[in-house]
Amino acid sequence: MGWISWLCPGINLKRWLLLFAVGVLLCALGLALFFNYQLMGKAEELLFQMTYLTTGRYSNGLIMTMGVGFLIVGFAIMVYGTRRLISSVVSVVVPDKNGSLMETIFMQRKLTRGPAITVVGGGTGLSTLLRGMKYITNNCTAVVTTADDGGSSGRLRKELGIIPPGDLRNCLTALADREPLMERLMQYRFQGDSPLAGHCFGNLFIAAMAQAEGGMEAGLNATSQILKVRGRVVPSTLEDIRLQARMTDGSIVTGESEIPKVRKHIKKMMMLPADAQAANGAIDAILNADVLIFGPGSLYTSVIPNLLVEGIRDAVVRSKAVKIYICNVMTQPGETDGYGAYDHVQALIDHVGTQFLDYAIVNSQDVTSEQLRQYDAEGSRPIKPDIDKIRSLGITVVPARLISKDDLVRHDPRKLARVLIALIYRLRLFGRGMQFFDYFFMRAGMKKLYKQK
């Protein structure tokens, strides 16, 4: 259609282009009157005649004043027309953005140039963290464990022969730039007595995409495009793996869902097969990261399993990224009974084989008695921060008030994101540029995060 398409009715652009042109003409007339330059002869002659008829004399000062007036009005019309023209275009190209245009542009530019953050873990703890990460950077990669063998994920794993999609779904949803309706849809679990009962729609969706695209990695990429995910979600391995735990009494328990049931103390985690290879992108994400974050999440069944995959442990040690561990706020029955924050850190170090952490973020907020009563029956207790003991390992401890205000004792993604933003800003990991403006970027990001429910 070419330039003729600009003349089509209903595109809501011509009126603002015309208004802008009127503003340009008024500015030109104002300049001509001010400098007494015969730019628009007929128009200026008419103004001179009107001035003479009104005042009875020709006043150069009055003509100059009129020129200034035309200049101001013309400039105002140009500005208004430009703003409405840009708003009209933006409302079509980016229809779901709220807030001012400049704020949107600034936030998107900053997020695109944000630090490369790789988060290693799984379970609900990881998705909680990712909800805050997407307001820090678009360069976030979640390396997710694929050892789940229970619930909907376990059924799909057995029936379709795919890696369990549950933790992958939670991470995709957490990073998605989506409407609340899409989130509810992805997390919807079928009810009743049908064969679909207990299945999560998001799990079925990912399984369908994996088959349609010819593999789980391609399926995850396609799902990310549909959900407009800010970042990437990659499985730690695409192989069919099983977790094993050697207990302190020498017994071995197989299966991620079975390990907590025996209620014994875990000595070491293992994986079957022991030589399972890392998925494409997992090792690259670790080696190319500016920040490596471990947790929060189940220590032995969500975080450590990633470190058992061939190549990932070595990549973690070799990575030059700042390495941060986020400790849980409550012990997990059957996994970390009686553990403090130091025990969590030491377990990570033992499975990697060397002290590799730079920072440990621990909760310093007390749990209310009302909240504790809900956990008494299952034996879950608040985790002690163990600040001095962790520091003795050469790790910088960052204590913070991290517990959410609801009935469940868990990390508040907003509080956690605020701590991470402050730490990353202090380490000057936002890249080159004027670090002064990062302060305003962080404030804008936190405002958006606190609006989330």
Language model: regions and residue ranges:
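C-terminal functional extensions of proteins
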Residues: 2-14, 338-453
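Structural motif
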Residues: 116-117, 291, 322, 359
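Active-site gating loop/helix substructures
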Residues: 235, 239-298
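Electropositive, gly/pro-rich neighborhoods at or near active sites that engage anionic ligands
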Residues: 1-97, 145-263, 421, 434-452
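Glycine-rich phosphate/diphosphate-binding loops and the adjacent beta-loop-alpha structural elements
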Residues: 185-211, 297-304, 330-336, 367, ...
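Acidic, Ser/Thr-rich low-complexity segments on the non-lumenal side of membrane proteins
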Residues: 110-137
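Conserved phosphate- and dinucleotide-binding cores of soluble alpha/beta proteins
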Residues: 104-113, 135-136, 141-164, 263, ...
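N-terminal signal-anchor transmembrane helix
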Residues: 87-118
